[in-house]
């Protein structure tokens, strides 16, 4: 009887293969149909400091200025200066100043959003992604998506249940 040695690389390859096969077999690629060709995608930012400002806010603002059908409607950060900087930048470039929040739950409750960009510290990614998917929002989240395997499974389940588009950025 031969014994197989388990190692991290083998575990990851096997797990990734099983996850991919499950996704293909169960048809979990369920991108929602947009509201219509004239509807703008309403986007909120959670954590528009550092990477959230440079990669998310600036890039999305540029896309809006170039004519993409998006509206940058809200920014949220517990550090007010990050939210203020993002809101001022968006207003300077687009003429519209997004609403500012300190609490992302309040932003999700008050704003009529279609999607969020998450650029908060890593330990918040899973919680915020699950919350946003549960509210029917499309999600772009900076890497890492999660800190643990259990969190990754929870995010996967939330995504499968939501039928929304989710992407994890790797710069």
Description of each model-found segment:
Residues 136-146:
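ADP-ribose/adenylate-binding Rossmann-like module
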Residues 2-137, 150-165:
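N-terminal glycine-/serine-/threonine-rich beta1-alpha1-beta2 phosphate-ribose binding loop
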């Amino acid at each position: 009887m031969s014994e197989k040695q388990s190692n991290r690389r083998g575990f990851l390859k096997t797990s990734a293969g099983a996850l991919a096969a499950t996704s293909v077999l169960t048809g979990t690629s369920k991108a929602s149909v947009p509201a219509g060709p004239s509807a703008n995608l309403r986007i909120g930012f959670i954590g528009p400091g550092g990477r959230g400002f440079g990669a998310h806010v600036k890039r999305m603002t540029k896309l809006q200025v170039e004519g993409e059908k998006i509206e940058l409607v809200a920014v949220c950060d517990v550090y007010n200066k990050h939210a203020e900087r993002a809101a001022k930048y968006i207003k300077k470039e687009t003429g519209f100043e997004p609403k500012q929040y300190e609490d992302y739950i309040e932003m999700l409750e008050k704003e009529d959003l279609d999607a969020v960009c998450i650029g908060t510290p890593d330990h918040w990614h899973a919680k915020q992604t699950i919350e946003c998917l549960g509210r029917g929002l499309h999600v772009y989240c900076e890497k890492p998506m999660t800190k643990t395997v259990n969190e990754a499974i929870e995010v996967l389940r939330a995504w499968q249940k939501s039928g929304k588009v989710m992407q994890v950025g790797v710069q």
